[in-house]
């Protein structure tokens, strides 16, 4: 959605390999991982075309940014991503998101209200985050940046921590 031509620019086999690799990695790490139901990004997987109407992704990204304003974006994203990718069918219905928000120390009704009433500002903040990501030297997620040095991918989190420790940072207790 951030990059509508993403799939057009990649090798046709990229998505198949990536999904194979992600499932393999989840098994290796012992992390539950299932195809999202529904996928937060509505798209035709056969043609790799991203739909114009996106009923899920804008809501959850705006709520994630609203959570960031409260200093709880990582907790919110962790809980919601476990719903989406952890096998919860119809994660967007019922109380699934409500309970995920509560586990993150947030109120879903409040996040939804902010996402609806302040959508333009939230979208601008998300666009600024995208610009900052590119200015840091990368374009994908997840990317961590420490002292101007980008670390792309979950497999680089340990490397980013190592670099922070080199700079004298200590883990908070």
Describe these PLM feature segments.
Residues 77-173:
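C-terminal cap of thioredoxin/glutaredoxin-like
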Residues 1-84:
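Structural alpha/beta surface segment adjacent to cysteine/selenocysteine redox centers
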